[in-house]
């Protein structure tokens, strides 16, 4: 089951209708949720990402905003989703971002957080371009602290490995640059090293070479 299917299954099983996509990027998750019949509001601090998302998903509502200061009233949403976005929030603001997501939930709502672990083939090949070890660990520590403080609770997190088809080093660089265009220049400077790491870590999947990335999903409800 892919990540998007996991999220939509959770939302639909919970009877969610109004969903906030926090850190939406170019709108990939928003597009999927709209197709599934959900009412989607999405935020991202990058105006260019929001502009691209609005063009791609005209049936969702998009706002330029940071996760640490959501411009919504309490009780506005049935669910909030951080899909690979919490670790992009500045570390000192991660806890506030989680509190904000809990604040805007309706009674019975939940916050879904999906984060990549600081391990695995995809991560190892990416490290010369951007080593996210510390920020990924900080995101998980923020979630753990929230639960330890008795602010939120939820079932044990789910962990799985996501395969990403990447035909070659060039395709891998393209994949990284789609998330952050600034990565391309760094990746090009590290092309020889990336090619070596790609050869060491890529495995053959049903559609050609792929790199796997372990992911973890939390479901958090306010206490």
Model-derived segments and spans:
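Conserved alpha-helix/loop element of class I SAM-dependent methyltransferases that forms part
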Residues: 1-17
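Class I SAM-dependent methyltransferase SAM/SAH-binding core
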Residues: 20, 25-69
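A conserved beta-strand element that flanks and buttresses the S-adenosyl-L-methionine
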Residues: 81
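Short catalytic micro-motifs in class I SAM-dependent methyltransferases
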Residues: 84-85
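A short glycine-rich, Lys/Arg-flanked "PGG" loop and its adjoining helix->strand segment in the class I
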Residues: 95-107
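Conserved class I S-adenosyl-L-methionine
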Residues: 112-137
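Short alpha-helix
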Residues: 136-150
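Conserved Class I S-adenosyl-L-methionine
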Residues: 150-223
């Amino acid at each position: 089951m892919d990540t998007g299917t996991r999220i939509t299954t959770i939302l639909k099983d919970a009877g969610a209708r109004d969903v906030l996509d926090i850190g939406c990027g170019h709108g990939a998750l928003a597009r999927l949720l709209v197709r599934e019949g959900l009412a989607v509001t999405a935020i991202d601090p990058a105006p260019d990402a929001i502009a691209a998302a609005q063009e791609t998903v005209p049936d969702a509502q998009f706002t330029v905003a940071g996760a640490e200061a959501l411009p919504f009233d309490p009780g506005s949403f049935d669910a909030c989703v951080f899909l690979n976005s919490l670790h992009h929030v500045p570390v000192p603001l991660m806890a506030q971002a989680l509190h904000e997501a809990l604040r805007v939930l309706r009674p019975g709502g939940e916050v879904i957080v999906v984060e990549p672990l600081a391990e695995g083939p995809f991560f190892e090949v990416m490290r010369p371009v951007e080593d996210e070890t510390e920020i990924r660990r900080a995101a998980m520590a923020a979630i753990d602290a929230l639960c330890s403080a008795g602010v939120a609770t939820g079932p044990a997190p789910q962990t799985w490995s996501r395969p990403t088809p990447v035909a070659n080093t060039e395709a891998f660089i393209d994949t990284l640059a789609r998330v952050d265009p600034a990565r391309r220049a760094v990746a090009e400077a590290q092309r020889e090293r990336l090619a070596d790491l790609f050869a060491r870590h890529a495995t053959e999947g049903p559609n050609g070479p792929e790199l796997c990335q372990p992911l973890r999903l939390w479901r958090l409800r306010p206490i």
